[in-house]
Amino acid sequence: MKISVELTLLPLNDNFEIPIKNFIKKLRTLEVKVSENPISTQIDGEYDALMSSLQEVIKQSFENEPSVVLNMKII
């Protein structure tokens, strides 16, 4: 089953650009279509592969950035 996931990463500090750029770089290493806009990043792919890969990227981001919010919409 194909899905689209819209992600918005919100680091809760003044230096927010670096964590966002690192998050997007990690998403680009996945074997999925990545589309960016000023507010969010959308990824498209097969549900099982996308969600298992995305889980690791999210975990790394939370470990590297102690104060961060991630908004995720699955369509």
Residue positions per predicted region:
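Charge-rich, low-complexity N-terminal segments
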Residues: 1-75
